[in-house]
Amino acid sequence: MAGSPSRAAGRRLQLPLLCLFLQGATAVLFAVFVRYNHKTDAALWHRGNYSNADNEFYFRYPSFQDVHAMVFVGFGFLMVFLQRYGFSSVGFTFLLAAFALQWSTLVQGFLHSFHSGHIHVGVESMINADFCAGAVLISFGAVLGKTGPAQLLLMALLEVVLFGINEFVLLHLLGVRDAGGSMTIHTFGAYFGLVLSRVLYRPQLEKSKHRQGSVYHSDLFAMIGTIFLWIFWPSFNSALTALGAGQHRTALNTYYSLAASTLGTFALSALVGEDGRLDMVHIQNAALAGGVVVGTSSEMMLTPFGALAAGFLAGTVSTLGYKFFTPILESKFKVQDTCGVHNLHGMPGVLGALLGVLVAGLATHEAYGDGLESVFPLIAEGQRSATSQAMLQLFGLFVTLMFASVGGGLGGLLLKLPFLDSPPDSQCYEDQVHWQVPGEHEDEAQRPLRVEEADTQA
């Protein structure tokens, strides 16, 4: 029986036990394998007779701060638009990112920085871990309100591994360039989440339809997330690019692309809106598509005009997606995309990957000069042509879509295990299922919810 004492006890213990197990296992693995790198270790750094001003901390940490704020504040508040799910949006973002950054340090460390029997970490490890956490949070947006915290932690456990493998294949085996993660972060996270949502499809989700909308103050809080993301996105795309002209160019291209996507979003929102009025959903999300679409190409010689054109296109495509494609996605394809990650991350991510194919194919020694080595080292060394680089960029997109689709399917099957607690159809998008909500009174909509109600569950 759904409401039996044994099930209630299991639900009470599920999250604490899983958190303790995952943190304990991670701590043991850190103790065995993780060590400071030579720029962090006291003895190794001073043995090299370096100046403290040469430490990468001073070059990379400002970007890390911005990326960190995007992950924990930007993503968290962007998802508080649901009128009864603000605690869960911010709280589960906090939980997922805190676990994902630890687990990804291990996974990425084994793949990228494992030597002499240890993983060596520094500030770049922190940035890479936050990038991985960002992909997990993108996937979270697709299933927001329909999953429990234990399910989300297991999703992160699987997704981080697949993210790390996909990133390793693209960046190290194929030599793909993807500085801002149009493919490795946005496309992967979006389609992993969308396939996951398809596997977890709820035919009776209409029972919670009254909670799916926003109210005035929840949309206002969500705009805080939008502004944080918009301001810091140039740092996100440029955080790990080559110091100097490459990093400068990446930030500049992202800056202009975001500005153009914002104007494109306002224009299309008014054009397709009822009586020419703006839709806050479009402004909160599609205005950010400019940061996604130049993720791959922002370190390349995209040109300021190219950045503006790409951003404007991404903003318009994303807005049209929210207006027309999201309803089709649910009615025809049975994908219930809560946050519209397909419109903000999926389509702009694919467009960004294709833009990277185009710009890589146009790369020449004349255009880049000595800077070709930092952007396309294999072309500079004569190991491949610009056309070959472009073809591998395109192949990298297909590899990412494959990893995301297979991973999302496996994740959906994992999250459907019967012993995992998830909210019934009539209690989705409701904080009271998982949180003590202060100030609640006796009206029917806000009474303590009964988990024993018989509904279809994910």
Curated annotation (Swiss-Prot):
Region annotated Disordered, chain positions: 439-458
Single GO term (MF): carbon dioxide transmembrane transporter activity
PTM characteristics: N-glycosylated.
Key words, A-Z: Ammonia transport, Cell membrane, Glycoprotein, Membrane, Transmembrane, Transmembrane helix, Transport
Region (Interaction with ANK3), start-end ranges: 416-424
Intervals of motif Basolateral sorting signal: 429-432
GO cellular component: a single term: basolateral plasma membrane
Glycan attachment sites: 49
Main function: Ammonium transporter involved in the maintenance of acid-base homeostasis. Transports ammonium and its related derivative methylammonium across the basolateral plasma membrane of epithelial cells likely contributing to renal transepithelial ammonia transport and ammonia metabolism. May transport either NH4(+) or NH3 ammonia species predominantly mediating an electrogenic NH4(+) transport. May act as a CO2 channel providing for renal acid secretion.
Subunit structure comment from the entry: Interacts (via C-terminus) with ANK2 and ANK3; required for targeting to the basolateral membrane.
Protein name per Swiss-Prot or TrEMBL: Ammonium transporter Rh type B
Gene symbol of the encoding locus: RHBG
